[in-house]
């Protein structure tokens, strides 16, 4: 769903409401001032029958000022603008928040219930919701998730890091040092750097230097600039916040280390850094508005049933983080490749989809045909399927 348009409509209503509130307060304040001014004059005027006409003139002046201010007219104008914005807002909600999303369902898709349950249980464990995960596994009758204990250990390390205790994280990183190097991760260096800064923060420069010699010097080949900054920061140890190295006080260093540890921990488990369930639901949420619009507008008029279609009836653009595989679109037919219509590399090196090659060779009745992008005569027997 397009939440931006909903937010924009809400912001317009909120702005009109604030303006209405501000204008109302302004008018009430002006009226109150005029009333207080008139009361002060009346209190100063002697109360006698001879001054009755003066009292009436004062009240007449107040009435004249009220007429000039025209509070009702001003309030009606702001209220009218607010009412117009409030009237439009529900229409935006009705347009964006489709109450019936069942039109986008594929009812004939078969799911392996066991796999779906395992994905859901794995999601709970990845989020650290171990009690909920255990309850879900028990109620569904599934066997315990094989990664549960590993995630328990991961969260034990993360909880220690929240307390600025780096020992569990360092122990894990050191024991998996070779694997982290293969993954080209600088996690171990980051953790040692944080420990170095914690020692230095305790005003113990000598201990920090000894720690750097023992644990950080080994990373000099790959992380020399970072090591130089760490060592120079010791010169500003007592006023690091006012130094060129104040970045070392940023909580972002710890947050980045936590994210990197989580990413690498999941990587060594053979898991993606993000939960498959989260990715699936988020990607589906992005594609849903496009599908609903297509179903409501196009499919309803054509009386087609997309339940029998092998591919999505419309292109659903997803954010870059959901693009995991290369996609080939045939330059001739403009169709996206599929299992039934894979990309084929011709002898000249150009690539077309299989169905396009079949059409150009008239379903194989011709042993060769001219490439549409170069003067080469393509031999059908030499066309090879590409795998991205």
UniProtKB/Swiss-Prot annotation:
Q: How is the subunit organization of this protein annotated in UniProt? A: Interacts with RANBPM.
Spell out the subcellular localization from the entry: Cytoplasm
Gene coding for it: RMD5
What SUPFAM superfamilies does the entry give? RING/U-box
Could you tell me which InterPro entries the record lists for this protein? CRA_dom (IPR013144), CTLH/CRA (IPR024964), CTLH_C (IPR006595), Fyv10_fam (IPR045098), LisH (IPR006594), Rmd5_dRing (IPR037683), ZF_RING_GID (IPR044063), Znf-RING_euk (IPR027370)
The GO biological-process annotations, alphabetized, read as:
proteasome-mediated ubiquitin-dependent protein catabolic process
Q: Which keywords does UniProt give here?
A: Cytoplasm, Metal-binding, Zinc, Zinc-finger
Map the zinc fingers (RING-Gid-type) to residue ranges.
Answer: 330-374
Asked whether the UniProt record includes Nucleotide-binding among its keywords, one would answer: no
- What is the protein named? Protein RMD5 homolog
The GO molecular function terms of this record are:
ubiquitin protein ligase activity; zinc ion binding
Q: Which residues form the CTLH domain?
A: 150-207
Domain LisH stretches: 112-144
């Amino acid at each position: 769903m397009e939440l931006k348009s909903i937010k924009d409509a809400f912001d317009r209503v909120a702005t009109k409401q604030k303006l209405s509130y501000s204008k109302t307060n302004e008018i009430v304040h002006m009226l109150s001032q005029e009333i207080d001014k008139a009361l002060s004059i009346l209190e100063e005027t002697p109360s006698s029958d001879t001054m009755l006409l003066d009292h009436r003139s004062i009240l007449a002046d107040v009435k004249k000022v009220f007429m000039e201010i025209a509070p009702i007219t001003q309030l009606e104008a702001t209220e009218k603008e607010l009412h117009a914005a409030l009237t439009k807002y529900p229409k935006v909600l009705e347009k964006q928040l489709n109450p019936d999303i069942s039109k986008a369902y594929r009812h004939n898709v078969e799911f392996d219930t066991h796999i779906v349950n395992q994905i859901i249980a794995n999601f709970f464990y990845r989020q650290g919701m171990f009690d909920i995960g255990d309850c879900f596994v028990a109620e569904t009758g599934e066997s315990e998730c094989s990664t549960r204990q590993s995630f328990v250990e991961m969260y034990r390390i993360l909880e220690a890091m929240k307390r600025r205790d780096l020992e569990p994280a360092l122990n894990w990183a050191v024991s998996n040092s070779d694997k982290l190097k293969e993954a080209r991760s600088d996690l171990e260096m980051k953790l040692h750097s944080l420990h170095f800064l914690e020692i230095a923060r305790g005003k113990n420069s000598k201990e920090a230097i000894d720690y750097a010699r023992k644990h950080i010097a080994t990373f000099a080949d790959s992380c020399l600039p970072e090591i130089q900054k760490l060592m120079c920061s010791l010169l500003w140890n007592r006023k690091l916040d006012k130094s060129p190295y104040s970045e070392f006080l940023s909580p972002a260093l710890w947050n980045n280390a936590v994210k990197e540890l989580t990413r690498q921990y999941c990587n060594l488990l053979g898991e993606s850094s993000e939960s498959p369930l989260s990715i699936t639901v988020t990607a589906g949420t992005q594609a849903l508005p496009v599908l609903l619009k297509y179903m409501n507008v196009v499919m309803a008029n054509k009386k087609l049933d997309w339940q029998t279609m092998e591919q999505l009836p419309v292109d659903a653009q997803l954010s870059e983080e959901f693009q995991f595989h290369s996609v080939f679109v045939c330059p001739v037919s403009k169709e996206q490749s599929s299992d039934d219509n894979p990309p084929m590399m011709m002898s000249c090196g150009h690539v077309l989809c299989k169905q396009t090659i079949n059409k150009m060779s008239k379903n194989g009745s011709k042993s060769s045909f001219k490439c549409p992008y170069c003067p080469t005569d393509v031999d059908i027997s030499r066309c090879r399927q590409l795998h991205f």
